[in-house]
Structure formats: structure tokens, C-alpha cells
């Protein structure tokens, strides 16, 4: 210890230096002896320094916030207690047990400047002793009243040792009496700190007396409660003893099956179960019925099953969920390749739920063709949010009772599938995937889609009423995700309750990536092969996609890869060499999968009159659609074949009406159609086709046939036509452009209003295509027909019919005329 420090210990006015140790939720009072466990490194260093350099004296002060591990000067109170270390015991875990004796109050500045040696392992501060005011004569009444209150408190609180009471009763000084009583009162450490800072002994004792009176009131109440509980327990024990005697009597009489025991068990379960008051009251009423029924009656079993259902449901049981956006994004990316927009929308939804901390919001509906990952995406969302995953298939459901349950009046009645699933998962906040919601149907038993209106309405599903339960059940904590292949069969009111997220079909590039990264490793492992046993080239995978599957998803692609793996496994086993390596290329793919199953539309080999290439959208993706028009002598009949739907048939009629209305523009007589028959055919006649987007394709094919001008075979088009020749926007542009790219089309004519949709088309597809935006058929024909634009629309004189001139242009092939590629 320094000389300055020794002088400081004797100079109370100027203050003296001591090590400081902060306490958590403990306030040290003068003349009190308290054992403390010390584990913080700075506190241990302060104690060691106090023993070696400061005569075992240390300054103990309480923290304002006990959670802080390393409190700063501003985190400590200014008033503490100079204490002496009486005993120290080091424990095996590195902590120490120290016995402190409080000596007197002291104060420090409570600022960073007051700390001496701020860089040391423990703080040292300069403290000033707080002098104690002397007691006055009129304090005697307060001291006597406090002694009486302490005696009363000691009679109620048996935890207070008799020796402690005797020692305290010998004190007559107000200040010392207050300091002696305070450590034994159950009050918050902040309240104790307030009393420590009171310098007047009489004032401090008065506050202690008030606290003592409050503790007496609380202790008296606790005593009454304990007495009441004890009496209740004695009464319960007496009832238990009598019930056991009754059981023993039944056993002696050979009646071991006591029906009341079963009801008692149900009542015990009910007492432990957390549930709404309505459900509890209903269960109690049903149990009263059970007590009055003979177990052999049929009604007894019905009531017993009903009570079991009430007790088994997770009314208020919620599973801990955690929404971590980064983790959710990682899970979605790991489980699904592509699908960026759907995944982004799901992450946005989860982010909102994390901020508002409630689930009330839109119900998500994932719409897309089969095999694109709708159900597995819902499963990944459950995994990302930590919820139980429940899948309920609605395909073929036609009975409303499947959703709402049967009324108890029916034999074998049960709750609906939703309540049954909640009982199975034992939590009230799972993720519910209502699969194939578009496959429900209606019959005389009701409309299940109407029952779902309540389930999928965030404003109503907190009071979902199942017919079997016949009471409200809260579904607002359930995360609902529905899936569908199409929205056409979903009623509009049900659609209105859901937020639609569309999952488009995969592009070929995405399928190829999915095959290499997900499907191939999965199937290789499933078939017992090593990764080195089988190698499939990119071209082979692309050939499988194009020639052996026709789908928007990847289910059939996985089946074909599994077939390749089976063939490979057979060859490895037959060769008897587990290290054998098989390479599948485009050339030998047929050895594994046989002949090709499908052919995708490709462009025509040559440019022909009346043959025009259009673009179509199907659930399996985009396709090239060839339209053929033939003319023959006749009486004006129009024949349309190829299994076309009503909309496509009407598009053909609209295209023909447009041509007739502008016959003079093309150099045709107004009554040209009366002398010929027009036959429009769309090949692959067994395949149904419909939709308005083939309008300009039909019109171009007819113009080509009427004028005898070939249509360029490297041009494809899509767009709806009006009677005025306007070109209207279409859907599925992404898939249609993929089909054009795959079919080696060079130029695609697209409605101008679809220009905004190009943002969703991958750049690798656009790179090989020339996209031309059109507003009118007048812009389509010069791009598609093998003649100059002036040749089609330039001549209007009757002396030189355009029909003959354009045919001559097409046959001669002028230098400025586009050539077919």
C-alpha cells in the first residue's frame, strides 16, 4: 500500500482510496455480515488487492442494472458500504466464497474521473465516509414501536432465526436498529439502496418501520392462504381416502370396473388443460352427464369420445417459432432452384409477420402446373419458420363434412380434417398446406369450397365452428398455404380470400440445372450407385428434357433419370465391378431410355404458301403452333379443323372477316370468298387447342393463301386480332419465346403491349431472337410474308391487281425481297 493511501485512510474529510467491487441485486448495510459468491475476474482481483494492500477493506456498491457484466461508472450507485473481508474460500470452479462485514457508509463521485488506475484489472476509487447523525431522545418511541413490530413479524415469519431477533432487540440506537433489520426484509434492492442513502438514522428507521408493517400484512396473508390450502388438502385427502375405501369394497364384491374412476380421470385432465372458458364449461356439462349414465349405454361412448376430443385438442398450445429471414432464404434456395419471384414474395410475407408479430394476414395460394414444387415450397416455408407441417389433400373432396365435421347426432361422427390434423400435431400454430384446392367438387352432400370460405378468411377463422365440436375454435394462429394447378375451377369468393402467387413452369436451362444439382445426386444415391459410377452429359440431359418428357415441372424428368440409374445399376452388377464408370451421352441415350417419346414443334423446312408458325402456351410450357390454310373452288364455305375450342374458332372467323372488310387493300374482289372454299387446319388434330392468341397467325396464313405469297419459315408470331386489325396482348410470353428459341425461330412478332413482359424472360433466350413489337396486322404482314412491304400495301389500282403482282414478286425473288433462312 502506498504512503498516500495510508494517509488517505486516516483523513476522512479528504477521502481515501479503496478497491471497488460492484454487487448485483445485493445492498450491503453497515454492521451486517453477508456471504457472497464472487465469479467476475475484476471482482476477484479487487478482493485479492484489498487483502494484500488495504487491510482487507473494500468498497461495495450496488449496480443500477444487474444484467451488466462489466458496468461503467455511470452504472453504479454513488453510495455504498466500506466492508471488511472476514473469510475467503476458493471453490473448484474458479469462483470464491467471501464473508463480508459492513463497517460504515461511504460515497464516491460516480464518474469516470473518480476511478484511479482505469487501465488496471480492477477499479480503485476515492471514497468519503458518511458521518452518522447522533440519535435524539424523541427517537425512543419509534425504536420501541419498531421492536414491537419486529416481534410480531418474527412470530409470523418462522424463517427469521430466534437468535437474530434477540440480537436485534438489544439495539436501542435508531440508525443501528434500521441497518440491522433491513437485510432481513424481502424488498427490492433499489428500495434497500434508497434506505442506504438516507443519512438520518431516525428517518431511516421510520422508513424501515413502514416496510416492516407492510411485510407483516403480507406475511399474515400468506399464513391465511397456507392455512386455507392446508385445510383444502386435508379435505381432499379425506375424499381420496374414502374413494380408495369404495374401490376396495367394489373389488371385494367383484366389481373392479368403476365408471366413476374414468370420469375422475377426465376431470383431472380437464383441471390441468389450458382452454377457453366456453370449452371448459361444455366439457364439465358433458362429464356431469357421464356420471349419471350407465357405461353400457350407447350414449355413454358418444359423450366419452366427445370429451376426449375436447381434452386432446391443443387449444392454447403453441410451438415456439422463429422467423429468421436469412435462414428462410437459405432454406428456400437450398430446396428449390429458380422460382425467384415466388420465393421473394414468401420472404416479404414472413418479414411482415416478424414485424407485426401476428399471423392475421393474406392466405397464400401457390398456383402453377404439376411438378414445379408448390407443395415442397410450402414444406420449406414450414421448415424455415419452425412450424409443424400439415398437408391436407382436397383432391376429390365433395363432402362439406370433410372440412366442418359431422354433427354428433350421426353414428360414427367425427370432427373435420382440420380439427383432426390439429389434434395429431398437438400444436395450435402449424403450417397447413391445403393441397389441390382446385380439385374439389360439389354434390348433394354440400359444397366444401363454401366451407373453406370461413377457414381461409383471416377475419373469421378465429371463430371457426366445427359441427362436431359445436363451439368456436381459433384458427388465427395457423399459417395457411393452398396449392392449385389452375384458378378456373376455384370460386371467385374463395379466390378473393387468398393472395395468388404464380409459379411458372421451369425453363429448359432451369430443368438442366435442377437435374444436375438435385435430381441426379438423389437418384444415384437412391439406386445404390457411387457418384463416379454414372456421368450424364449436359446434352444428354437436354435430350431427356426435350424428347422424353413434356411437362412444366420436373417429375417425369426425375422418373427418366431414375430409369437411367436402374439401367446403370444393372450394368454395374452384371460387370461385377463397383468402380465401373458409365457415361451417358446424347448418342447412346436411346440404349438407356429407348425410342423418343415426344417431339417438340420445330420450324418448317421451307417457306410455304398458307403455312404460318404461331406460338402457343400449355401447362407443360410453350409450343410452336403451325396453322395451314388451303383454298379450293367452291361456294364460300369455311372449314376449321384441328379440335379447336370456341375461342380459337371465333378468332379464325374474326381474321377472315377482317380480310373481307379490307379486300380492296389486297387487290381482291369484294365477293372473292363466294367462289372458293377456305379450309383452316391446325395439325395434331387429337390435341385440343383454344385461346385467342393465334389471331394474327390465322390472319397471316389466310392472307398468304389468298395472295399466293409464302410465309417466312423463320418467323413466328402471337397476338389476338380484332375486326379492325388491332393486335391485342397475350399471356405466357416467357414460355412462348422459349418455344421459339428451342424451335430455331429467328424472328418473333409480339403485341406491343407485351413489351413490359420481356423483363421476365431470361437474357440467354432473348439473345438468339429478334423481337418485333406490332400494334396492327398491317405491321405483321410485311414482316411475315416473303414480299416487299410496298408490294403488299402499295398498289390499289384495279388495272394492276395486287394478287398477280405479289405472286410475281414471290416467284421472281427480287433483290430487296427477304429470303427464308
Swiss-Prot record:
The keyword Lipid biosynthesis does not apply. It catalyses: Hydrolysis of proteins in presence of ATP. ATP binds at residues 368-375. Its main location: cytoplasm. Residues 18-216 form the Lon N-terminal domain. GO terms for molecular function: ATP binding; ATP hydrolysis activity; ATP-dependent peptidase activity; sequence-specific DNA binding; serine-type endopeptidase activity. Induction: By heat shock. SMART domains: AAA, LON. One of its GO terms (cellular component) is cytoplasm. Keywords: ATP-binding, Cytoplasm, Hydrolase, Nucleotide-binding, Protease, Serine protease, Stress response. Residues 606-787 form the Lon proteolytic domain. GO terms for biological process: cellular response to heat; protein quality control for misfolded or incompletely synthesized proteins. It comes from the Bacteria. InterPro entries: AAA+_ATPase, ATPase_AAA_core, Lon_bac, Lon_bac/euk-typ, Lon_lid, Lon_proteolytic, Lon_Prtase, Lon_prtase_N. Its EC number is 3.4.21.53. The active site is at residues 693, 736. It is found in: Cytoplasm. ATP-dependent serine protease that mediates the selective degradation of mutant and abnormal proteins as well as certain short-lived regulatory proteins. Required for cellular homeostasis and for survival from DNA damage and developmental changes induced by stress. Degrades polypeptides processively to yield small peptide fragments that are 5 to 10 amino acids long. Binds to DNA in a double-stranded, site-specific manner. Belongs to the peptidase S16 family. Homohexamer. Organized in a ring with a central cavity. This is Lon protease. The gene is lon.
